[in-house]
Amino acid sequence: GATARHNIRLRGGQCYALLAVGGQGLNDVDLKLHQGGNQIAADDTRTAFPTVRHCPSSTGRFRVEIEADGGSGRYFYQVFRRSAN
């Protein structure tokens, strides 16, 4: 399926949860988080609501990849800062 890429900046010492939501007609979305050339987190389960969590040790640029793996349509994503617990 089609893949969209978004660059984000995450702060070291913080924890984050990323959520993608497939809109109408998009019933399987894959969500991946990369830093440099390395994939560091992924959710490729068969769902329209994938999530990943990451607590980077240092501040840096990350790439979010959102892939339409079943169906087609719009998607939405959000990055939440969360507690380390």
Located regions from the model:
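Acidic, Ser/Thr/Pro-rich low-complexity intrinsically disordered segments
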Residues: 1-76, 82-85
